[in-house]
């Protein structure tokens, strides 16, 4: 702090004490803005983190067709299997299709099949809750999952899900592939391949592979735990996932629908879209929330800036004679300008200090009501710097007008 600035502090404080109500109002306005802006920035960051969550699959190469046939209205397992295999064979022949698979669900798809997971058969409380993907034989390659350890399923490890259901107490799912998040939770610091867990059946399931990541269809706040069972699920209305080149997705999707309609006139298409579109729909509310918070931040900053401009302009008008006297006594325009900037800086600093305490209190309330995480400390200096800069920008106009007051004003006002 320069010597001139230090000398200005005492008269500034004296002036502010004579205008307690106005000073208090601007301090409270800055404090409230700081508190809301810090928490809003945090919530925007949280939403952006969710929206940018890694799915683990080849996002830009996949299209989804959710379809069924009127022939499947009989609820006959044999018919379901016949129709599903017929559709899958048709889709694999479509030009541009590199891989195709039938899946029961897909990341960010909304509907999720979940199951508790135990490490021992007699465990009372589950270790975790994981989403369950069923694989008819080509899920790993079609999704583009990255194997970190172990291997993919062998052909002799697959079974129809209807056979599993008919087996009753004797049902077994000998092997499974899990994602890294689940592996780290179940077996921290260990190699998960070869380890066993219990889920769906009374028999142990052995881990044969670990994929880097595989997101849940929903309930993202429940942990990113996912497992893949080698189960062929041929029920009506399943998802047919096609993998192609990013630039050919629309072309392949259109050709695939035409091929299916040619194969089966009784085709019923429930959904047809790219995975990017699936993802965009899932995070639509998060995106809307982020934009709403941006609008709130801009509105608050604008109102605060207008308040600072209005108050500073009022004070300049009231102190015209005082400014003229200081100019007559030798004060330069720069000194007058810095005087008002320092005055604003002091008000903003008090408001920001109160705002940080208020921001933390609001965050504690949100944590209790909506289970949000704790406000990271780095958002506080971000909000502080933003308000300091805003204050200096807002006061610059009135301060320049004050600096332009000529010394002669002092004599005319006498």
Spell out what each predicted region is.
Residues 49-81:
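Membrane-interface junction motifs in transport/secretion proteins
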């Amino acid at each position: 702090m320069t010597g001139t600035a230090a000398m200005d502090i005492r008269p500034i404080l004296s002036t502010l004490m004579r205008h307690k109500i106005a000073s208090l109002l601007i301090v409270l306005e800055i404090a409230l803005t700081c508190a809301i802006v810090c928490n809003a920035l945090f919530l925007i960051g949280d939403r952006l983190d969710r929206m940018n969550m890694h799915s683990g699959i080849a996002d830009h190469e996949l299209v989804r067709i959710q379809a069924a046939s009127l022939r499947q209205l009989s609820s006959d397992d044999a018919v379901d299997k016949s129709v599903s295999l017929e559709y899958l064979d048709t889709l694999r022949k479509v030009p541009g299709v590199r891989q195709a698979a039938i899946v029961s669900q897909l990341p960010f798809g909304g509907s999720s099949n979940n199951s508790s997971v135990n490490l021992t058969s007699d465990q009372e409380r589950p270790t975790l809750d994981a989403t369950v993907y069923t694989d008819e034989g080509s899920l790993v390659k079609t999704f583009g999952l990255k194997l970190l350890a172990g291997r993919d399923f062998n052909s002799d490890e697959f079974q129809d899900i209807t056979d599993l259901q008919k087996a009753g107490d004797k049902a077994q799912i000998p092997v499974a592939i899990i994602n890294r998040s689940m592996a780290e939770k179940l077996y921290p610091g260990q190699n998960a391949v070869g380890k066993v867990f219990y889920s769906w059946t009374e028999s142990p399931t052995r881990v044969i592979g670990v994929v880097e990541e595989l997101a849940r269809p929903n309930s993202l706040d429940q942990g990113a735990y996912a497992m893949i069972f080698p189960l062929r699920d041929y029920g009506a209305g399943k998802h047919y996932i096609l993998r192609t080149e990013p630039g050919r997705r629309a072309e392949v999707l259109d050709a695939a629908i035409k091929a299916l309609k040619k194969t089966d006139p009784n085709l019923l298409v429930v959904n047809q879209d790219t995975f990017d579109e699936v993802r965009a729909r899932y995070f639509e509310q998060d995106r809307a929330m982020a934009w709403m918070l941006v609008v709130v931040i801009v509105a608050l900053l604008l109102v605060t800036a207008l308040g600072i401009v209005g108050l500073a302009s009022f004070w300049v008008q009231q102190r015209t004679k005082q400014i003229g006297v200081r100019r007559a006594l030798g004060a330069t325009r720069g000194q007058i300008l810095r005087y008002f900037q320092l005055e604003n800086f002091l008000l903003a600093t008090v408001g920001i200090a109160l705002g940080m305490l208020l921001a933390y209190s609001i965050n504690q309330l949100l944590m209790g009501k909506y289970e949000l995480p704790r406000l990271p400390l780095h958002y506080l200096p971000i909000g502080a710097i933003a308000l300091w800069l805003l204050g200096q920008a807002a006061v610059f106009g009135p301060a320049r007008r004050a600096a332009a007051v000529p010394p002669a004003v002092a004599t005319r006002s006498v």
